[in-house]
Amino acid sequence: MNSLRVLKIFRSVSRSIRIPASNGCINLGRNAYRVQLAKAPFSFSSIRRSSHTAGNPRSKLINALSSEIDYEKNQVLSEISLPPVNYDIEDVQGSAVVVLKAKHGDENIRITMNVSQDVTDAVPEEQDFTEFEDEQELQNQGESAEDEFPNEDLGRFQPCTIEISKPGNGALVFEATALDDGFDIENIYFSKDIDMLTSDSLEAEWKRRKQYLGPSFKELDPELQDLFHSYLEERKIDESLSSFIVSFGLTKELKEYINWLESVRQFLK
C-alpha cells in the first residue's frame, strides 16, 4: 500500500482517537496501526451489488444480507491448528472476547483478546504520528518510509493482554500485539493486587489510575526487554502462540460477522 495513503488514513484516525474506558489494561502503542485494514476481511461488495433488487425495502435488505452471507461463507479461511500444548481456549459464540489459559508450575497464565477491537480502540490518545508526516521529505531525499522504518511493514495483528499470576503473590501483565512472527510488547505492569490489576470493574479501573503499575516496555533497557521475552518464551508465549492468536482472531471475527448477519436476517423475516 502506498505510504502516503497510509498517512492519510492515520491522520483521519487521529482526529477521533479515544482511549477505551472498559478495560484499563488495553492501551497499545505505535505498532497498533499494523493493518486494521488487513485484519478486516469484509468487503460488503455483495450488498452493493444487490441494492437494486426488486421488492420493498425489507425484502431488499433480506436479499442483500443473504448475498453477503453467501459471499463471506465462500471466503477461503486457512486451517487453524490446535493451540500450543497446555493451552485451553474459552470461546463463546456471540462474544468478541477469547481467552487462552494455561498453567506453568504455580503460575496461572491468561491471554485475552478482543476480536472487535478497532483502530480507535487500539491507538492511544498520545500516539505520535510525526513519523508518517516525514514521508514526503524522505521521498524528496530519494528514500522511502519502508527504508527508514524497515520493521514497520503492514501485516496481520491481534491486540491481546498477557497475565501471569501467582496466588497470593500478585500478577505480571503485558499489553501486547500478537503478530505472525511474535509478540510486540508495549507496556508491562505488576501489582500484588491481582483483582485490581486484571478486573474490568469500574472500581478496579479507578484504582489502577491512581497507582504506578509499571513503565512503557520500550523504555526498558534492551537487555531487560530481551530477558522478558525469554521469560515469556519459557512459558510457550512465543512465535508459535502469537501466530495462532492472529489466525484464530481473524477466523473468529469472520464467524461472528456471519452469525450477526444471519441473526439480523432472521429478525427481519
UniProtKB/Swiss-Prot annotation:
Under the heading InterPro entries, the entry gives:
MAM33, MAM33_sf
Per the database entry, which stretches of residues form a coiled coil? none
Q: Which domain of life is it from?
A: Eukaryota
Gene Ontology cellular component terms for the protein in this record: cytoplasm; mitochondrial matrix
Report any Pfam family annotated for this entry. MAM33
Q: Where in the cell is the protein located?
A: Cytoplasm; Mitochondrion matrix
Q: Hey, what's the signal peptide range on this chain?
A: none
Q: Which GO BP terms sit in this record?
A: cytosolic ribosome assembly; mitochondrial ribosome assembly
Q: Which UniProt keywords apply?
A: Cytoplasm, Mitochondrion, Transit peptide
**In the UniProt record, does the keyword Cytoplasm occur?**
yes
Q: Where mainly found?
A: cytoplasm
Q: Which family does it belong to?
A: Belongs to the MAM33 family.
Which protein, by its recorded name, is this?
Mitochondrial acidic protein mam33
